């Protein structure tokens, strides 16, 4: 590839260079085949994510975490969370105009938050609560490895795009205000949603 493209000046669009690379390296037929396959997999992935988010919002609405009237609604004929499906689609349509960095900002932030708390929860649950801190193996599995994981994720936090941090703080602030309203200034317990097998 370095022989074909010694630097990015040869690309018409450096942010979307894959189709150009495939055209020059393998020809138009290969380029079309990969682009069609990529389109199908993106649509399948998007449909699965759309359905998953809609159903999660339904469960949260059903259990009172979100307003039940809207989020807990199920279409009587199709048995789908229709309002949630439409809401997710409307938000997805708003994202069409976003550039790649802005569109991936909340995903990057969400992943880093999740991975950080997964590591911290291992320490909290096993090393502190269950007191699995007697042997060297316990210290290694339930303290050292999760701390290493949290530090590794911490290195990624340092390199996070500024737009991700700003969007994350805004999103977190909205969530905090919503939780304060739902719990009447944190005097009532936070609503929990229940898994139904």
Curated annotation (Swiss-Prot):
Q: Check the record and name the InterPro entries matching this protein.
A: AA/rel_permease1 (IPR002293), APC_superfamily (IPR050367)
Q: Name one GO molecular function term.
A: symporter activity
Spans traversing the lipid bilayer: 33-53, 85-105, 107-127, 140-160, 163-183
State where it is primarily located: membrane
Identify the domain of life. Bacteria
Reactions listed under catalytic activity: putrescine(in) + H(+)(in) = putrescine(out) + H(+)(out)
Q: How does it sit in the membrane?
A: Multi-pass membrane protein
* A Pfam family assignment: AA_permease_2
Q: Name one GO cellular component term.
A: plasma membrane
Protein role: Putrescine importer.
Report the sequence similarity comment from the record: Belongs to the amino acid-polyamine-organocation (APC) superfamily.
This chain belongs to the protein called Probable low-affinity putrescine importer PlaP
């Amino acid at each position: 590839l370095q022989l074909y493209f010694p630097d990015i000046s040869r690309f018409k669009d450096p942010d979307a260079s894959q189709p150009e690379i495939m055209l020059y390296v393998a020809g138009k037929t290969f380029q079309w085949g990969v682009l069609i396959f990529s389109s199908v997999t993106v649509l399948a992935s998007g449909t699965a994510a759309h359905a998953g988010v809609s159903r999660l919002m339904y469960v949260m609405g059903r259990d009172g975490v979100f307003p039940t009237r809207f989020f807990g609604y199920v279409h009587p004929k199709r048995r789908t969370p229709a309002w949630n499906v439409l809401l997710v689609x409307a938000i997805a349509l708003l994202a069409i105009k976003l550039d790649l960095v802005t569109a991936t900002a909340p995903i990057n932030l969400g992943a880093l938050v999740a991975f950080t708390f997964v590591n911290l929860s291992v320490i909290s649950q096993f090393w502190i609560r269950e007191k699995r801190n007697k042997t060297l193996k316990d210290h290694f599995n339930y303290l050292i490895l999760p701390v290493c994981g949290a530090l590794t994720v911490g290195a990624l936090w340092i390199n996070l795009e500024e737009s991700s941090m700003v969007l994350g703080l805004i999103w977190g602030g909205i969530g905090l205000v919503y939780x304060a309203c739902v719990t009447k200034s944190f005097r009532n317990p936070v609503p929990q949603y229940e898994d139904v097998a």
